[in-house]
Amino acid sequence: VSAIKPLVLVTGATGAQGGAVARELLSADFHVRILTRNPQSPAAQALIAAGAEAVVGDLEDASSLAAALEGASGVFSVQIPDAAGTDAERRHGFALVQAAKAAGVTHFVHTSVCEAGKHTQFPRWDSNYWWQKYWTDKWDVEEAVRGAGFTHWTVLKPAFMMENFAQPKARHMFPHLKQGKIITALLPSTRMQLIAADDIGVVARAAFVDPGHFSGHNIDLAIEALTMDEVALTLSRVLDKQVRAESVSPEKAIESGVFAGWVRSQEWTNEAGYQADIPALVQSFGRRDIVLTPFEAWVKRHAGEIHVDA
């Protein structure tokens, strides 16, 4: 008689990271419950069709969290940065940690961002040039996870997601890609560390399957560090389209239609940037038969979602 499948509540399941985690856990025979405001959305319906159970709930609503967590032994936690100034990321993160602890959850896997925790060492940190609250919110929620007293916890810290080059995200992140251009304020020499959302799912699954190994770890996630020229060359080669990178001033980037907060983040990448120890990561994951996806392989897999008319 097989053991009862452990139940994991996945937040953000209709987004890139949560969706990847939900799919990986379903494929590993976990019982997956997704927390969603709209179970009728195509993303939620696809997961339901794959075997997930959907509960209607909201990180704003503590009573909905208690119901969603009933019987759950694990939680996958992801929050959206608070752009509206309502402290939403911390409120949601803290509420989920508290509700999970109260519900008897034993393994809490949380996704944050690479370099959170090193933020006070960034050049120009004190001037608030880098949207300090983005970094301090991420760190505060991480600290809440580590300090809550879960039997097992794991914090995943991804670098820049490859999904930003595919639809629907590319429309906002790389608005010129459709015309065969990647226009950014990244310097030609700046390398951006990349990770596929699917791989965040793979690592989260590994953490739930083998808490003994992954518990108590803060894990940076990146596989490659590429310049935008290298990104453009890879896209050109795989898609058989002309894609070229243009490095412009921050002012020019904003003028061309790249949103200001993202341009500021590009400046941060020039001056600080994600600094995951990729060789060490590859080695430690390799020992557990986890192979992260290089950018070229990711482009091949997602070619249909990368829209270039050029």
Where are these regions (language model features)?
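Oxidoreductase cofactor-interface core, primarily capturing Rossmann-like NAD(P)-dependent enzymes
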Residues: S2-Q45, E60-S63, A67-E70, G74, ...
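A hydrophobic C-terminal alpha-helical subdomain
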Residues: E24, F214, V238-L239, P250-A310
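Rossmann-fold cofactor-recognition segment
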Residues: L47-D61
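Acidic/glycine-enriched edge-of-secondary-structure segments
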Residues: G51-A54, A83, M192, I306-D309
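Short loop/edge segments at beta-strand edges and connector loops
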Residues: V56, K157-P158, S247-S249
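Glycine/threonine-rich flexible loop motifs
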Residues: G85-R91, E271, D277
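A general structural signal for well-ordered alpha-helical segments in protein cores
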Residues: G93, K138, A170, S265-W268, ...
